[in-house]
Amino acid sequence: MKKLLILLTFVSFVFSKTFYYDVYVFFFRVGEIKIQIDKEKSYAEGKTLESMKWLYSYDFRFYEEKGDMKLYEREKEKVRVFGKDKIYEKKPWIPLLVDYLKTGKVKENNLFKVKKEGNKFIVIPLKSKRVKKIILKDGKVPKEIVIHGKVKIKLKLRKAEDDKGTV
């Protein structure tokens, strides 16, 4: 049974795309994020760089499958688990980015107000108190994502690849 589960996990991610982003606060690189997407499910993980953990320690794991979502996060020594509704309140940029990388579209709905300006989307999360604005820049695979909250955070694309190599 254990071997079957490992095989199914491997097969489900064989036809996938993986995106690597570096995380910046001001002009300091503070972390990294990896997002893996296939047709049925998505996975994202992020963490503070080892060299920055003395200042701030945070990591997360996000899982999405057929509309169901879970976010596991560890901040300093606190561990929290969020379901779909809480994710859209606390970290709306994660499911937004995953969906955008999956479909190439940002959908305006009861969760997001969307405005397109040239080659960027400006997204206002309607359920979040912390995140005020998310900007996706430069195309179907955003080269830069800017998250406006208490602190402005930038994600810069380092690498994108699929099963055949670099996208």
Curated annotation (Swiss-Prot):
Keywords: Membrane, Transmembrane, Transmembrane helix
Main location, first listed in the record: membrane
Entry's localization field: Membrane
GO cellular component, one term: membrane
Membrane-related topology note: Single-pass membrane protein
Sequence intervals crossing the membrane: 5-27
Keyword Transmembrane part of the UniProt annotation: yes
Name used for this protein in its record: Uncharacterized protein aq_1581
Organism: Aquifex aeolicus (strain VF5)
Source organism phylogeny: Bacteria, Pseudomonadati, Aquificota, Aquificia, Aquificales
